[in-house]
Design a protein with these regions (language model features):
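Conserved nucleotide-binding/hydrolysis micro-motifs of P-loop NTPases
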Residues: 24, 50-51, 74-77, 105-111, ...
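Conserved short-loop catalytic and cofactor-binding motifs
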Residues: 78, 128, 296-297
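Short, glycine/charged-enriched secondary-structure capping and boundary segments
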Residues: 21, 83-86, 115-118, 218-221, ...
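Conserved G1/Walker A P-loop phosphate-binding module
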Residues: 1-113, 122, 131, 141-142, ...
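C-terminal-of-GTPase-core extension/linker across diverse P-loop GTPases
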Residues: 2-7, 12, 18, 146-356, ...
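Long, charged N-terminal accessory/stalk domains
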Residues: 87-193, 204
Length: 367
């Protein structure tokens, strides 16, 4: 399951965003710093109209969407890397997620205090970036000291790791992230073991005023974009209004659509955030259909039928024979597996077949 950690300074809208994502009141959204002490965890459905269409056609007993796990982590402050505020708890929780959603305040409201004074998304961006880098710096320095001793004794694996760690250390000292150290197989392997924060993919959720939604943001969002670009970050920025999303979460059906239209937006910011997370991590969806259920599954783009089988159950991999495959568009056009077979649209693919986004798969296996 994809795990995204929601981070940011106190009072930027993290917990309000989390509440809207999970359509719950699990996260305390009071207007004071550190209202989220322990991380709140919520499982959110991945919005995908294709699953609803398959459900209409097949009419099984149930519909099972793909899901994303969001973790609302306590607000970070300057000095967290040295344990200030809730720094140590924050840093331990964030190391466990697949990617980071950095919520940046891009709105002004005198009733919502900012822990650092006036609204300044560039300053907030820099604080978060530097604290994560400082935390990683300590981890890398300690690991490098230990690994150098092993490398001097002639250990080839340790010698490779020293090269990677020295490159990472140089990037961190230059104010950049570990992700800038390259994407060689060795770098990926060693960095994964360390769980470095700045090696994790990141996207920005820019919390803007509701009035700025239709225009795609305002002056504060423009400044955040400039800051991200100046750091040469290839990170997507998703504008949203936590207040608007919280109100939208209370509505359903036509009321929901009307409320979106009134704000001049076509899609909830939360949906865009989830889709951005998928894109960031290189994920895609495939489907299985049957009398009991239609289900959406998540896998990495470029993954094989064998890998997809493992997403369902290890037995599917162990006894893999073939994957009977039909493209989503073809399945919807003819309406069923039976019709797809009759029209020669079902392909018998082996374990090395590269699954395409939206493929409808039926696995044949024997254990």
């Amino acid at each position: 399951m994809l795990r995204l950690g929601i981070v940011g300074l106190p009072n930027v809208g993290k917990s309000t965003l989390f509440n809207a994502l999970t359509s719950s009141k699990a996260a305390a959204a009071e207007n004071y710093p550190f209202c989220t002490v322990e991380p709140n965890v919520g499982v959110v459905e991945v919005p995908d109209p294709r699953l609803a269409r398959l459900f209409e056609l097949v009419r099984p007993k149930r519909k099972v969407p793909a899901v994303v796990e969001f973790v609302d982590i306590a607000g970070l402050v300057r000095g967290a890397s040295q344990g200030e505020g809730l720094g140590n708890q924050f840093l331990s929780h964030i190391r466990e997620v697949d990617a980071i959603v950095n919520v940046i305040r891009c709105f002004e409201d005198p009733d919502v205090v900012h822990v650092m004074g006036p609204v300044d998304p560039v300053r907030d961006h820099d604080v978060i970036t530097s604290e994560l880098a400082l935390a990683d710096l300590g981890v890398v320095e300690r690991r490098l000291e230990k690994t150098r001793k092993t490398a001097r004794a002639g250990d080839k694996e340790a010698q490779l790791e020293v090269v990677v760690l020295e490159r990472v250390l140089a990037e961190l000292n230059a104010g950049r992230g570990a992700r800038e150290a390259g994407e060689t197989d060795d770098a990926i392997r060693f960095l994964r073991q360390l769980g470095l924060l700045t090696a994790k993919p990141i996207l920005y959720a820019a919390n803007v005023n509701e009035d700025d939604l239709a225009a795609g943001g305002g002056k504060w969002l423009d400044r955040l974009r400039a800051a991200v670009q100046s750091h040469h970050e290839e990170a997507e920025i998703v504008p949203f209004s936590a207040k608007f999303e919280a109100e939208l979460a209370e509505l359903a059906g036509e009321e929901r659509g009307e409320y979106l239209a009134s704000a001049g937006v076509r899609e909830p910011g939360l949906d865009r955030l989830i889709h951005a997370g998928y894109h960031l991590l290189g994920l895609q969806t495939f489907f299985t259909v049957g009398e009991n259920e239609v289900r959406a599954w998540t896998m990495h783009r470029g993954g094989t039928a064998f890998a997809a089988a493992g997403e369902i159950h290890s037995d599917f991999q162990r006894g893999f024979i073939r994957a009977e495959t039909v493209a989503y568009e073809e399945f919807v056009r003819v309406g069923s597996y039976k019709a797809a077979r009759e029209q020669g649209l079902v392909r018998s693919e082996g374990r090395d077949y590269v699954v395409q986004d939206g493929d409808v798969l039926l696995f044949r296996f024997n254990v």
